[in-house]
């Protein structure tokens, strides 16, 4: 329903009614301008908010039954299905890539699951313009060694090998981040806060 303003006359009643109408229009206009300004401000703020870290990790779908082909395929699917464009930029190779430590304490990859080593995985993920991550444990052994009876995870944790493993994972293999679990740390009875602080 369209409401027309009253005719302006010199009679006091109409003058008062007209003033009320003008006051109402002025208040409504101010409210509309305020609402628009607030919406613009919110939109500007929303543009500056960084999304949380989002990505994919191999553990929930595959546990320790992973391979080079599986990781590459999942990274490809993240791009193909639009997850990368939606902000999912992290690909985490979870427990299951470990082979064994040699006599010098250097970690090697599982020869059957990752015959080409781990650097090609990081390079492949980087080629898709995403971040590559690895798993380890704060203790001696990994969760897979306890929950999945994966013998390769025994002694594969970062405990006692922090600088050595950091150089290998970040420097030599080229990974961007590391997920540090706590199954092995808990089994050793380590203080969680102190342990994670020392790793940092």
Annotated model-derived regions:
Residues 74, 78-189:
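Aromatic-lined carbohydrate-binding/catalytic grooves of carbohydrate-active enzymes
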Residues 68-71, 118, 196:
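Generic preference for well-ordered alpha-helical elements
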Residues 67, 190-192:
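Short, solvent-exposed loop/turn segments at secondary-structure boundaries
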Residues 20, 45-49, 159, 172:
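Alpha-helical interaction segments
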Residues 39-72, 77:
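N-terminal module-boundary/linker segments of secreted carbohydrate-active enzymes
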Residues 1-41:
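Bacterial Sec-dependent N-terminal signal peptides
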Residues 193-200:
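Catalytic-core region of carbohydrate-active enzymes that cleave or remodel glycosidic bonds
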Residues 25, 46, 81-83:
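Generic marker of residues within folded, mature protein domains
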């Amino acid at each position: 329903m369209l409401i027309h303003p009253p005719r302006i006359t010199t009679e006091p009643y109409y003058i008062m009614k007209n003033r009320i109408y003008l006051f109402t229009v002025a208040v409504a206009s101010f409210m509309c301008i305020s609402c628009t300004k607030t919406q613009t401000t919110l939109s500007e703020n929303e543009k500056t908010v960084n999304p949380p870290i989002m990505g994919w990790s191999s553990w929930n779908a595959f546990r320790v039954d992973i391979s080079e082909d599986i990781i590459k395929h999942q990274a490809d699917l993240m791009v193909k299905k639009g997850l990368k464009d939606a902000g999912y930029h992290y690909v985490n190779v979870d427990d299951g890539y470990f082979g064994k430590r040699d006599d010098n304490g250097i970690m090697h990859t599982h020869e059957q699951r990752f015959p080409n080593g781990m650097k090609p995985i990081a390079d492949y993920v980087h080629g898709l313009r995403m971040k590559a991550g690895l798993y380890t444990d704060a203790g001696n052994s990994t969760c897979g060694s306890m929950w999945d009876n994966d013998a390769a995870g025994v002694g594969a944790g970062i405990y006692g090998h922090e600088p050595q493993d950091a150089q290998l994972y970040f420097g030599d293999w080229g990974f961007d981040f590391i997920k540090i679990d706590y199954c092995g740390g808990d089994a050793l009875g380590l203080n969680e806060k102190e342990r994670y602080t020392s790793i940092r």
